[in-house]
Regions:
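PLD/PLD-like phosphodiesterase catalytic module centered on the HKD motif
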Residues: 1-208
Length: 208
């Protein structure tokens, strides 16, 4: 990708619409609405990336069904991914960790950090990187229905923002361990459902 294309797309989103925009790599505010969902953007980024690293606090079982289907396609292309998550507030169900562990081209790490509440999705496309950061956890409600705000930005690895992000991810990885069956067994033994849960909407959009 020519530097001028990426530069104009960034300037279009952050400085002035007089610059040439680009729907694929230009800065965007992602929300759930009648025409699109956050999950649709995540899915597109997954299917077009060379590898990815996510740092996300909460994950629900119902989102793993479409995610595992995408990961199966990526496995045929040799694409690997990493998810850093945690046991924060006991939100994540033990069965969710078991399902993640079944995905062969996915490395799952458990952050050993108090108050781990990140929601960041980094995709490496080779010539450029894309990050989605905002309010959405990897839950069906957040990615399909809820009023969520997430910023999508693309840049080169040499960009200051992405160097900061990479450094932060490296720091979180350093404070994490690889998910194991032993960890899941111990978590399941002590796990209790959270006393308060986010209310689920009555109707959820079908996952595409």
């Amino acid at each position: 990708m020519d530097n001028s294309v990426l530069q104009d797309a960034i300037l279009n989103g952050l400085i002035s619409t007089q610059y040439q925009g680009n729907a694929l790599i230009g800065p965007q505010l992602l929300t759930n609405n009648q025409s699109s969902t956050i999950w649709q953007t995540l899915r597109h980024e997954l299917l077009s990336c060379k590898n990815f690293t996510w740092s996300v606090a909460f994950i629900t079982l119902d989102m793993l069904v479409p995610f595992k289907a995408v990961m199966a396609d990526l496995a045929q292309q040799g694409v690997q991914g990493t998810i850093i998550t945690s046991d924060y507030l006991n939100f994540n169900h033990p069965a969710m960790f078991e399902e993640l562990q079944k995905i062969p081209n996915l490395t799952v790490r458990i952050a050993d950090l108090n108050g781990f509440h990140t929601k960041g999705y980094l995709f490496d496309h080779g010539e450029y990187q894309t990050v989605i950061i905002g309010s959405a956890n990897f839950t069906r409600s957040a990615l399909l229905v809820n009023k969520e705000w997430n910023l999508k930005l693309s840049s080169r690895q040499e960009g200051s923002l992405f160097q900061q992000l990479t450094a932060e991810l490296d720091a979180v990885k350093h404070e994490s361990t690889v998910l194991t069956s032993e960890w899941i067994a111990a978590y399941r033994k002590n796990w209790q459902p959270p006393k308060t849960r986010v209310t689920q909407p009555e109707k959820l959009k079908p996952i595409e």
